[in-house]
Amino acid sequence: MGRKWANIKEKKAAKDANNSRVYAKFGIEIYVAAKSGDPDPHANQKLRFVIERAKTYNVPKHIIDRAIEKAKGSADEQYSELRYEGFGPNGSMVIVDALTNNVNRTAADVRAAFGKNGGNMGVSGAVSYMFDNTGIIGFAGDDADEILEYLMEKDIDVRDVVEEDGQIIVYTEPEDFHHAQEALKEKGIEEFTVTELEMVPQNEVTLEGDDLGNFEKMLDVLEDLEDVQKVHHNVDLPE
């Protein structure tokens, strides 16, 4: 699964290069998580893990605090979690996760991003069966075997643990993602480089020429949409 981690790193690097957009998206995600339950992260697991993920993107504390304070107030913006599936050039597959307060706007924007760049939006389930929902947790370390043994002792369903470039990368079943992160904290691991629930493709495709150019443009347009939180795909992008 090493290549999957490489793809995560590439996506994180691209997002880190556009901080204002990342901060705005996390602000909404934190607001929604805080509004859906207790605004105290210690009493709201969903909020706690969104904050943990935000920290891996270096989202400043004041952005996090402002979103939580907004949730405590009288504002009551209604957001919907949506997933769109579609096809890019030459058989590439794309899943788009969105968080929106205007479903019609988001659907139109996502459809246009596909259609104008050699792709087309499909129905629910059109491509998701070719992806595996996977928890991915990364942190500094070099003993993958020790971490695997520790997590197995905690009865956590682990798909794989690898060491790569001074990082331990843990791949879990989605239902054990949060349990694994809590167990690692109990072990004294306080700083994570990645905490993601990713739709990992079962197989990747390689694009070339115009197909690659159109796909990368489509990806940029989708990720620039304010309502889009994540874009998953099965393309092995060149480094």
From Swiss-Prot:
GO molecular function terms listed in the Swiss-Prot or TrEMBL record: DNA binding
GO CC, alphabetical: cytosol
Originating organism: Enterococcus faecalis (strain ATCC 700802 / V583)
Source organism superkingdom: Bacteria
NCBIfam families, per database record: PRK00110.1 (NF001030), PRK12378.1 (NF009044), YebC/PmpR family DNA-binding transcriptional regulator (TIGR01033)
UniProt-listed HAMAP family: Transcrip_reg_TACO1, Transcrip_reg_TACO1_YeeN
Protein name from the UniProt record: Probable transcriptional regulatory protein EF_2866
InterPro entries noted in UniProt: Integrase-like_N, TACO1_YebC-like_2nd/3rd_dom, TACO1_YebC_N, Transcrip_reg_TACO1-like, Transcrip_reg_TACO1-like_dom3, Transcrip_reg_TACO1_YeeN, YebC-like
Subcellular location per the Swiss-Prot or TrEMBL entry: Cytoplasm
Protein family: Belongs to the TACO1 family. YeeN subfamily.
